[in-house]
Amino acid sequence: NAGGEFMQEEDIERLGRIAEQTWTRHFDDRLGLSHEELKRLEGVPAPALPVVEHLISDKPEHKVPWGDRKPPVAKDDPRNIWGFDMDAPQYSFDRGELHNLSIQRGTLTAEERFKINDHIVQTLIMLSTLPFPRALRDVPQLAATHHEKLDGTGYPRRLGGDQLSVPDRV
């Protein structure tokens, strides 16, 4: 998937069948990993070699939980005082091999797309803490609405055209 085409459901099913194939690994799969990756593997025992594994796999250690870093984007989150209305993915990152190879459209996973879209969330949170002079008091609002769409499918608040002022729409 180079990003310009769509992965059909049949292709994803075929990928799943390919992933079920096994191979015998004769080397330590922790060699050459970054400190961050090794930290995620703490508590996961290394199997005795050689070991039979699936050709492509989504392992529990591929899923990186949010912990206390989940941004307050859910509409019902009590920390959400900005009116965000976004669906955060279940995990902060999902580095599963099958998960990443099964992207139906484009090249970004839901987790990666959320990280990109989170820039406006962080921008609004930061800008709302700054003491803007009266003439610039709308800067946080204007910055936060540049990804909204008139049909209400934009982010970070899913505002529709009737909720957006003319400056918000520009």
PLM regions and their residue ranges:
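Metal-dependent catalytic cores of enzymes that make or break cyclic nucleotides
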Residues: 1-170
